[in-house]
């Protein structure tokens, strides 16, 4: 809110209506002679703001505010301020929708004042709240700075300066709340002491006496209850025991009679069964004799089996040799490939070194040639100068010959420069002839280039559209090729799978879902397909197969419920054994036993389960099958481990021999054919490959269908793209064949040739300079020689010796480089030759590998054929053997069963005799017990309810009955003694006293809790006050120093705590003038002290800015330069607030944006704008 217009009518020296408009929103100054009414404008503003202290507006009563106290015909004083309220963020509460706010205060002679807001009458409190909401509280006017306030600040003590900071921070309110809380706490403490005294001196002694009496009464009640309970327990136990014995004997009698009847029937039935079984035995013996008289079919089948086994052994031996040859050749091939790769790398390295050495050798040779030429010329010169004839016998040597040669070279270089210059001139002339056509050609070419660009952009857009649709022609081709490869691979893998499937037929497990929502994941599968053997452990396959035995084809399921459902409703096609994970019990070999076994035979023993990989979910099944057997390398190790006293575990050798700690040994001759478990592993791997290939094939097929569908959708775009590509090709051809393009190309060629000529001229000019220098040098040497032949000749001889030495060194270097060059050349040729030889050898090895693979494939096919025949023969042989074994097994079973029946019959007869004797004894005991039970019922009525008796006995199970009888006697004696001493009314008396005690303790606890909360509140208030005070002090002292430095350059001031005290105990002003800190403000001049006070006031104003500030001649004690600094400070630092300043000094109002001048005319004040 900013002052926009001030209307004064009848207020103090303004007798008539005076309107002061065009107030600046930032800096306004009022000036004029003393007594002209300057300060009356400020008084009028304070009057409207609702000032209550008349002394502030220099009046003793409201009547003094009317012009000449109403004696000049003016009977009321009225002041109106119109505020600009366009800044909604700083608007008073409830006035955000008013762009202007008009506030009027009137005082009538002899009456009271009234207020109007926007022309409507309003109570004084509403006006005060309006201004307080925008920090214009006239009754605590921080925004009003009178001259006297500066003097007051100068004389403030540290505690008073701290009060200014507290006022700015707003922590006075915290002091009031703290004092209130301390008064409340004092009252609470008094009440607390009263309650504690009452509790200690009156209630607690009385309560202690009553509690002693209560304890005695409770003890009496407890004794009475224990006595009744103990007597009931003793009687219940006696009755229950007798009753239980009686019932037990009765049941025994009934069961004995039933059992006797059953035994008689069993003996009779068993005799009949034994007779029947003897007849069956005789019949089976006759059948066995008939089977033994048949021809020797088994012998023929065994001979045929041995022949097939020998053939398989021979073929596998051949295959093994072939495989070894193949592996050996493959290893050699790999070694050759590695050697070829290494040799190729070395050859590249040698060739690189050879090229570098060749380059160095040529450079050295060139330098050597130049050095020899220089030496030869020097030698000829010395010879000519010495003898008149050169070393070659020519008479035209010496300086003259060298000078002639140098001049010839100089002429040749000059001629070359002229030729290049002439060529460049001709090119420039041709360039001038092309230039007129170049502009038109460029323009025409730009059109062609633009056309090519447009065609290219069209093609790019069409390609982008195809990409958006996800269509890629090359992708379809790649997918089609991949689909063909996957199909071929799939058919071949399926063929291999079918072959292996015939060899492992028992792996098939098919079932129908027992019910629709059957959880298929609960059926884990056949054991043989649930684990894998790593290639490193494949040699253990026979041992692991022996370890698993028939369980290899068992089916693992999650629980017994799943197993039951499969057996009852799964429609299984063959008999299977199911392993439910929740029912099997495992006893795997412990880690300690395994460690001991490995220590006894290091590297030769391992737990079977550790040689396979499987899913964690079926760990229990794998432990059940493989967890209790050790795999050993050889029979010696197996014996050592199996029969060790601390191990005694089942062991299996790699050949499949089983060693049992009970002394059983099984094994011997086994098939030499490949292990069934290896076939199962191969079959499992191939099945996984088929699944992977099928998934890849499905993915490729889906992507192909997507691409075909996209191709149909984008046919139009593809046609447009082909057409655009054709247009682009035509446009490029047109661009290349266009004469304009040829002109531009020729222009570029000429510019390039001109550049080459310029470079050649520069190079030749450098050579020309060298030739000129050489001519000058020779001429200079000739002059020196003519003037002093002896000295010059000696100098030339020295140079010749030095050149000879350098030539010798360079020749040595040349020879060294040549030797290195030749060595590298030989090494490179040798490496190249070796590489060619190795490549030829590798080619031969690869041919051998292919040949061996074909031979191996043929052998494997033959082996598979023979193995198939072997399987057929073995099946027939097993069936024949099984028929004989079945007869023997059946005969043994019948004989065992007869023996078992005879034993059962004998045992039943003995049991029958004993039972008759016992029954007679039990009948005599029953009558005695019935008499005792009847006596107890008559004595204790509660025994009629046997359920109650049973519950009593159950609750006190395991007690010592004799101890309880003794305890019952002691309790009865104690009960009779206590009955004489107790007070039966004690419970009612103690209840009232305890309630009073509890109420007092609750009250004390509540008061202590309230006291603690008050203390916490005071502590929090002190912490918050200090934090707020420190932040305010830090901000104010910073602004204080900056403002003082602006007012008095090269100076600084700050607020600091008194020496040795905290910031909350008082603040004092420290001033630095130049580089010297002043000990006291007394050392400062009056103007400097005024600046200090004014800087502090301005810093406080800046901490919590108000929308308007009123300053009344605050610069009275300052010189002109300081006054000007204050004006500048207001203008630069307080941009968000409106200042109204009364000043007589030009330095102040020269900085103001608006200056009002007052003057006294005809007895009234008049205001004008400067």
Swiss-Prot record:
GO terms for cellular component: chromatin; condensed chromosome; condensin complex; mitochondrion; nucleus. The keyword Nucleus applies. GO terms for biological process: cell division; chromosome condensation; mitotic chromosome condensation; mitotic sister chromatid segregation; negative regulation of meiotic DNA double-strand break formation; rDNA chromatin condensation; tRNA gene clustering. The keyword Nucleus applies. The flexible SMC hinge domain, which separates the large intramolecular coiled coil regions, allows the heterodimerization with SMC4, forming a V-shaped heterodimer. Central component of the condensin complex, a complex required for conversion of interphase chromatin into mitotic-like condense chromosomes. The condensin complex probably introduces positive supercoils into relaxed DNA in the presence of type I topoisomerases and converts nicked DNA into positive knotted forms in the presence of type II topoisomerases. This is Structural maintenance of chromosomes protein 2.
